[in-house]
Amino acid sequence: MKTGKIIKVSGPLVVAEGMDEANIYDVCKVGEKGLIGEIIEMRGDKASIQVYEETSGIGPGDPVVTTGEPLSVELGPGLIESMFDGIQRPLDAFMEAAKSSFLTRGVSVPSLNREKKWDFKPTAKVGDDVKSGTVIGTVQETPVVEQRIMIPIGIEGKIKEIKAGSFTVTETIAIVETEKGDREVQLMQKWPVRKGRPYSAKINPVEPMLTGQRVIDTFFPVAKGGAAAIPGPFGAGKTVTQHQIAKWGDAEIVVYVGCGERGNEMTDVVNEFPELIDPKTGESLMKRTVLIANTSNMPVAAREASIYTGITIAEYFRDMGYSVSIMADSTSRWAEALREMSGRLEEMPGDEGYPAYLGSRLADYYERAGKVECLGNDGRIGSITAIGAVSPPGGDISEPVSQSTLRIVKVFWGLDAQLAYQRHFPTINWLTSYSLYADTIDKWMNGNVAENWGALRLEAMTILQDEAQLQEIVRLVGIDALSEKDRLKLDVAKSIREDYLQQNGFHEIDTYTSLKKQYKMLNLILGYRKEAERALEAGVYLNDILAMEDLKDRIARSKYIHEDDLEKMDQIVVDLKNAIDNLINKGGVANA
């Protein structure tokens, strides 16, 4: 370990000399308190160090010691249900060590609990050939998550010894005989955060990640292994949308990174998730969640590390064969941290002061998402779905972070302040949003949900787009200028908007909608259009059709029908057909 000397302090940036033996991205202990920092630039024997803790009180002449290791995370049992800061210090152990409710400088705590014992059940036996990524046993970490203990990257050989029983994360569970001698394997392994974990092959994502949010699953789906962005102005509901996806998304593991956002938003997650029950497992949602809290009142530099820490933990669970979703809230704050460090390093600024390499850094992050065939000999398939919130100042998505993100991701959920003011949630604007996975996922839906799913989705989307054009005419010359067919189209579009797209995240039934129910709801609304058009062709007045208040009310309330009572929707379809038949036969208002 080489000791250097500080010659300059500029906020979170410290420059030290005498560091000629250090490497870029090495972790350093800065000052007498041993603050954690990372070398981000080397010039001769001078190192520029990004410090992840408050640097007040540090000055020229103070020592800097390099550890010779890059910033790494500890991967093993104990990750699930934990809450870490941006450099993977567990906040509960941090509080005990610091004896304070506030983040204290210079406190060093291990990321994974060194005392807790975990029950290890071997699945491999002595004499088995193993290589990087081979699963040699399991640990039941929570009732929902089984950790598959893998051979660390870079080890290949024969198992010489393997033990069953209770072990801490640092105790040896197996010995592998390699060409370079015996290698010990523990429950825990380390991995540098800036380097993506390797895999056998990348696979094209075709299966949707279901979220239970109708506007997402039906119109703008994201594939398992895809990448999505949620840009929107303040108060448009980015965080609530991410919370909903984290709660109800059908990923097996959720990594939630609160990066530079308000502390009370992380508090909401910590308070809500343990009480919410996962509809698939019947267990608390917290039993499959890893939280990384790096809120706006924590040091700016640590924001950059928090995103990498999160994606590395996600890759570890992906390598086990799980489907993982990672929420980053918000990547704009992370980009602001990059901008601050770039300014302190006196680099040439790009657009709006952001560094010229902003686009490539964002791409590095999103490209670590994807569906892959994992290392090992059993052909496991794992995926990471990355969902990043973007907070453009004033909601202007022409700024660099939004534009760089949109060039990379394939799904854009554009949040609209106008919809938020109208109390329409989720505030995803159906005219500006898009999903490049929609055609691929339609094929999956047609095969797994209903043959005409894609056709229904297209019909509903066309109606919503036509509505926007018809609204222009109505604003200019009034609704009376429209034909009856167009007025009916406006009525159906209103039903799609208010009864289908709008969803109450706080209602116990409406907060989550299965694919089967989504199909039945959409089929019901578009079935109403089909029947109403049949009546118009038979000469029934539009006002008589619109006067069927009771039936329209039942269609609107179908979103509150329980998942176990979906046959009630089939009854509404029958009643609707009968009511239209009555109208055609009588030529008057149906007594529905």
From Swiss-Prot:
Molecular-function annotations in GO: ATP binding; proton-transporting ATP synthase activity, rotational mechanism; proton-transporting ATPase activity, rotational mechanism
Keywords of this entry: ATP synthesis, ATP-binding, Hydrogen ion transport, Ion transport, Nucleotide-binding, Translocase, Transport
EC number from the UniProt entry: 7.1.2.2
Highest rank taxon of the organism: Bacteria
GO cellular component: proton-transporting ATP synthase complex
Keyword Translocase applies: yes
Catalytic activity: ATP + H2O + 4 H(+)(in) = ADP + phosphate + 5 H(+)(out)
Enzyme class, broadest EC rank: translocase
Biological process annotations from GO: proton motive force-driven plasma membrane ATP synthesis
Protein name as it appears in the record: V-type ATP synthase alpha chain
Organism for this UniProt entry: Clostridium botulinum (strain Eklund 17B / Type B)
Name of the coding gene: atpA
